Amino acid sequence: DVEIFAVGVKDAVRSELEAIATPPTATHVYTVEDFDAFQRISFELTQSIWLRIEQELKSIKVKSLTPPRDLSFAEVTSSSFRVSWSPAAEDAIAYLVNYTVALGGEEFVVSVPAPTTSTVLTNLFPKTTYEVRVVAEYPEGESPPLKGEETTLEVRGAPRNLRVTDETTDSFKVGWTPAPGNVLRYRIAYRPVAGGERKEVTVQGNERATTLYNLFPDTKYHVSGVPEYQSGPGTALNGNGATEEVVGEPKNLRVSEPTTSTAMRLTWDKAPGKVQRYLRNLHSRSAGGDIKEVTVKGDTSTTVLKELDPGTAYTLSVNPLYASGAGTAVTGEGATLQERGSPRDLIIKDITDTTIGTSWTAAPGMVRGYRIAWQSLFDDKTGENHVPGDTTNTVLRNLDPETKYRLSVYANYASGEGDPLSGEATTEASPDGKIVKISEETETTMKATWQPAPGNVLNYRVVYRPRAGGRQIVAKVPPAVTSTVLRRLTPLTTYDISVIPVYKEGDGKTRQGSGTTLSPFNAPRSIKTSEPTRSTFRVTWEPAPGEVKGYKITFHPEGDDGYLGEMMVGPYDSTVVLEELRARTSYKVNVFGVFDDGQSPPLIGHETTTLRDAPRSPIPSSGLDCTTKAQADIVLLVDGSWSIGRPNFKIVRNFISRVVEVFDIGSDRVQIAVSQYSGDPRTEWQLNTHKTKKSLMDAVANLPYKGGNTNTGSALKFILENNFRPGVGMREKARKIAILLTDGKSQDDIVAPSKRYADEGIELYAVGIKNADENELKEIASDPDELYMYNVADFSLLTNIVNDLTENVCNSVKGPGGLNPPSNLVTSEPTPRSFRVTWVPPSQSVERFKVEYYPVAGGRPQEVYVRGTQTTTVLVGLKPETEYYVNVYSVEGNEISEPLAGTETTLPIPSVRNMNLYDIGTTTMRVKW
């Protein structure tokens, strides 16, 4: 072989040099920048070449020395083996045995002097492969090595300390101390010492115990445990164990064949195991009773107990006896028989439709209980009750109504039942069965219906007569029929009706009822109660058919007829508010139609008052101030009928306050009178009564509630004759206005009085609430209806019309000759902060104009005044890009016109335009725009 050193100069590629040179490249490849640099590597290159020459000379010399031969291994154990070889040349001084784990690890050396050619390597790891090299030593050096490998055996041994624990009759637990080494499994063998089948189980090598099952009881076993290794079995560990004897208890102890005097038979199921004898104990349960013990053979399971006391209870036990001792006893009870008797004096009481109560005098002797049997005499239904021996009464339940039963009471003894005590009883009719139901009433007939009676009914006898007295009528009805029509009755009369089932043996339970024939007068319909408060609620109904003359309403707390309230309303009224009621109380309401010859049956309703009144929000002020020099006489005609009620009348007062508060009250301005009407109208105050607004507002706040029927026509006539006249404050040149507030249909004519208002030049406003008749309101109000007629569905909705009504009444006060507003509003010249407002003045001259403006989105109104000859102005100081309301008023003295209204929006702030940069330097420039 040729060993190559590679030297690269200047641009030589090192990877090519490494491919050419002999490994290792660290000592065989060199590079220099140019030829002048050879001096730098010459010493290192020369030294490497000389070192390799010395190594080759030494290798040649070693190869000339004779190595040992025929390496072999013997006596292999888990921690040692013997190494042997054939000798080398005669001049060998000694042998070096080098060994190490084949997978890597520390190397060990043993020197063996020549001519010995064998040695034992010790302290080795079990089941481990070792690499062994044997070198012969000569004076000139060491020979080449003789190499080989050997593997130690795995550790094998025996487990120790065999233990047997947890013995039962068919198992015990075997435990041991583990065997050394890597045990794969343990094989546990066992067989009875006295001989028998050998069995074995296998457990994992990491287990330290196992339980042997299905063993023979009371048997000694020989047990051995052998560890198994990968290389084979280890040494066995032997020992002995034994199961326990089977010990138990007999089962199902039974007493049979008791007699009245001396004996009873005792039987049981045998106890498990080898029972030698049974110990039988007998103990009287009475105080001071002796204990008797007798033994019988172990193969016996029955015995007769003799010489016992009659009528006596005994505690019994049977205990198995084994060679190892006593087992567990089974216990029971038994009793000899005693003489039997019967209860006496059967009493039947507390009978209802489904129950019968019974009691009796106790039977003699040791009674364990009573059985009470019952059987229907009408059908095959039967049943029974059971009570303890110290109880002498019971209630039979779930019986059929109106049924005859035979009852039997049996005394129950340990030896059986005595003779029965018997009797008979009949249940009452059921609550529904006692009742005759009345339906389909007319003026002269009614239908009677009842539940069928049980059993073999021959017929039903129907008896009826007027409750107030009169001739009794009797009818017979077939047994299959349970209803009949009673005829030839008197109208509006209450009858008492009885229905008696008739049997062959006699009469059954009577059914009773009552009914009233109809009135010839029809009742109102569809009653409805609503709007409950702490002391009031509303009652509404649909009118009764026919020529009704009015309605009577009675009411009282539920269950308290003594507190009966009553009121009358007219034929056109269909609603009323009941007042002065108790808080949180349920009331019954009756509404009768009243006719010339009598009244109808009642229409009945129910309602419950509340614990407290719900808060009501007052009607807000309109905010209007009716400023005018005009004079006006206003009369308010207020409906105070029962259909309004006090809570709603408070709302009416609040509504009147909101209407009248806008006017300037005085003898030279506006005067207001109020009249209230129902059945008969009355003046609350005249036009000239209140000279100031404060006095008027106080009077409105204290306006009393009148109550009564709704007679609107006579009320309109009343204020024409009593309020619109000079003697009570009416002024000839003042404008005359009437305002009607009503919640119902008028009971009298309204056409003629309404026409008189138009004829006399009085403007008439009509405000209807809730139940008002809209056609009637249009007939009453002045034209047009859009200005003079209002109708709302509820009192709480008056707040929705107060502003419009107040404004229209104010315009009526001002009259057609009032101050006219300007016209033709034009806005122009808008900027971000201003715009111009222009208008056309009214036909008459005015002192000045008021211009009011404020943002549409909300804000405080601002105003400016200009002379009456000026018809334009610029509003300044505004917000950019904002929409404004604008109102322009004509002003003359203290009088102000209606507004001329419009809107305008300011412009947004404009952005910069035409920006130019010039005179630009290194740190400055000029900007213009």
Swiss-Prot record:
Domain VWFA per the UniProt entry, residue ranges: 1-49, 633-805
UniProt PTM comment: The triple-helical tail is stabilized by disulfide bonds at each end.
Glycosylated sites: 98, 231, 324, 415
Record Gene3D superfamilies: Immunoglobulins, von Willebrand factor, type A domain
Domain Fibronectin type-III per the UniProt entry, residue ranges: 67-156, 158-250, 251-340, 342-432, 434-521, 523-613, 821-910
Superkingdom of the source species: Eukaryota
Pfam families: fn3, VWA
Alphabetized SMART domains for the sequence: FN3, VWA
Main location: secreted
Keyword vocabulary terms for this entry: Cell adhesion, Collagen, Disulfide bond, Extracellular matrix, Glycoprotein, Proteoglycan, Repeat, Secreted
Entry's localization field: Secreted, Extracellular space, Extracellular matrix
GO cellular component: collagen trimer; extracellular region
Gene Ontology annotations of biological process type: cell adhesion
Family per similarity comment: Belongs to the fibril-associated collagens with interrupted helices (FACIT) family.
Family annotation (PANTHER family): FIBRONECTIN TYPE-III DOMAIN-CONTAINING PROTEIN, TENASCIN
Function (record text): Type XII collagen interacts with type I collagen-containing fibrils, the COL1 domain could be associated with the surface of the fibrils, and the COL2 and NC3 domains may be localized in the perifibrillar matrix. Could play a developmental role in regeneration.
Assembly behavior: Trimer of identical chains each containing 190 kDa of non-triple-helical sequences.
Protein name: Collagen alpha-1(XII) chain
Native organism: Notophthalmus viridescens
